[in-house]
Amino acid sequence: MAVKIRLKRMGSKRNPFYRIVVADSRSPRDGRSIEQIGTYNPVVNPVEVKIDEEKALDWMSKGAKPSDTVRNLFSNEGIMKKFHEQKNSK
């Protein structure tokens, strides 16, 4: 089962709010997810991002691949750097 970390759209029309979820790559964008690991609100200024860093690192170490947008969010929060350090220290 290929697992991805991606955004699940919530909110109302023209007012998007996203959950950062772990889901099977074959499931629909807003379909069933395995676990929620954070939220992303692009509407407010500054952008609001909340991520459970421990869960994100755990899922990536198990082989979950983040989508391009989630990878950018993780990079801004410093999670990708921690993941690479953790991966290279083994």
UniProtKB/Swiss-Prot annotation:
Keyword terms, alphabetized: Ribonucleoprotein, Ribosomal protein
Q: Name one Pfam family in it.
A: Ribosomal_S16
Q: Which Gene3D superfamilies match?
A: 3.30.1320.10
Q: Which GO terms describe its cellular component?
A: cytoplasm; small ribosomal subunit
GO process annotations (BP): translation
Name one molecular function that GO assigns to this entry: structural constituent of ribosome
* NCBIfam families linked to this entry: S16 (TIGR00002)
Q: Which family does it belong to?
A: Belongs to the bacterial ribosomal protein bS16 family.
Q: What is this protein called?
A: Small ribosomal subunit protein bS16
* Species in which this protein is naturally found: Oceanobacillus iheyensis (strain DSM 14371 / CIP 107618 / JCM 11309 / KCTC 3954 / HTE831)
The gene from which this protein is expressed is: rpsP
